[in-house]
Amino acid sequence: SLMQFETLIMKIAGRSGIWYYGSYGCYCGAGGQGRPQDASDRCCFVHDCCYGKVTGCDPKLDVYTYTEENGAIVCGGDDPCKKQICECDKDAAICFRDNIDTYDNKYWFFPAKNCQEESEPC
């Protein structure tokens, strides 16, 4: 679920996903189009693509299970669809963490009119 995604971003990247990525670049937040503006925005693009491959459950609403083992998030549970959502969220949170140094405030609340370039395929 999106609330779990927020929790994973806090645990892994150490910052609020809603605050920092809720409306960032061309892909972070609702929707997405155009060309990712930087590495952090690309994390959101890849996350959107990952959610797009999920079938049989709702990535934004369905709750998944995970554990923390030696500081790492381990996705679990018996439902392969929900496990896939967890992996999408975990990978995005790791991507945010690994690209924190590229985060640029100029892409915060970036106008959609600046995201008109042709989108690349997933």
From Swiss-Prot:
Tissue: Expressed by the venom gland.
Top-rank taxon, per record: Eukaryota
Gene3D superfamilies: Phospholipase A2 domain (1.20.90.10)
PROSITE patterns (alphabetical): PA2_ASP, PA2_HIS
Enzyme nomenclature, EC number: 3.1.1.4
Annotated InterPro entries: PLipase_A2, PLipase_A2_Asp_AS, PLipase_A2_dom, PLipase_A2_dom_sf, PLipase_A2_His_AS
Binding site for Ca(2+): Y27, G29, G31, D48
SUPFAM superfamilies: Phospholipase A2, PLA2
Descriptive protein name: Acidic phospholipase A2
Organism of provenance: Gloydius blomhoffii (Mamushi)
